[in-house]
Amino acid sequence: MPKYTDDDIFDDGAPQVAKGFDRGIDYLDIAAKLKKGLKKNYKVLQDTESTANAKRFAGSRVIYIIIALLQLKNCSRISEAIVATKKFSVSKNLNERVVVKIAKSEKDLIDRKTKDKIHTKPRYRDMVFPVDLVDTKIFKYIVKTKYWTKFCEFDSPRKRVLDFLLGHYECNTHSLRYAGINYLLNVEKRDMNVVAKFVGHANVNQLVLYTQTKALDEIFDRKIVV
């Protein structure tokens, strides 16, 4: 029998193939699961027999799910979704868009050639409230509660939403963003330039890389019938 060294089998030093941020989350499937979770937890809040502790958990979950659905609908970064949710909480018309600063658009860089410092100007994008995914009655209710007040006081709200998604839906916030992008590109067949503009990319480079990775996965997963 041939002999194999550990390096042959366990090549820890081998370069990793870039897989992007996608975690194989289906847009419609995760949207349905989140909507179901939203209704379930809202029901706990409305139940007069629910304990204070049960309502506390349900209140937090309602907020996290609404933010997740808003992120999914807009294919946004989680920080953008949180800012948008806060803006919608004081909006008189949830059918109107809000404007948020695109995360990481404003930053300090070093020019590789001149070594000069470069400060990029912030860019902004529109966000819509997911009225097709979130009952506005639930949203208007939750933003008037102590659970919303406490959420707005958190130092790291992004981590709380992320931990909730990982623990209850086995996905992360990047998964939601790219599930939405995947749906726009591969199901609705939207133009890549339009999608890049919608999600806040400065160009289509990242989307090209993403679609190439998805296409590569499809080649690996293809079934050959003989």
Swiss-Prot record:
Taxonomic superkingdom = Viruses
- Catalytic site: R97, H174, R177, Y210 (o-(3'-phospho-dna)-tyrosine intermediate)
Can the keyword Metal-binding be found in this entry's annotation? Answer: no
MF terms from GO for this chain are: DNA binding
Report the InterPro entries cross-referenced here.
DNA_brk_join_enz
* Keyword vocabulary terms for this entry: DNA integration, Viral genome integration, Virus entry into host cell
The keyword NAD is assigned to this record: no
An example GO biological process term is: viral genome integration into host DNA
Family from the record: Belongs to the 'phage' integrase family.
Q: What does this protein do?
A: May catalyze site-specific integration of viral genome into host or helper virus DNA.
Protein's name in the database = Putative integrase V10
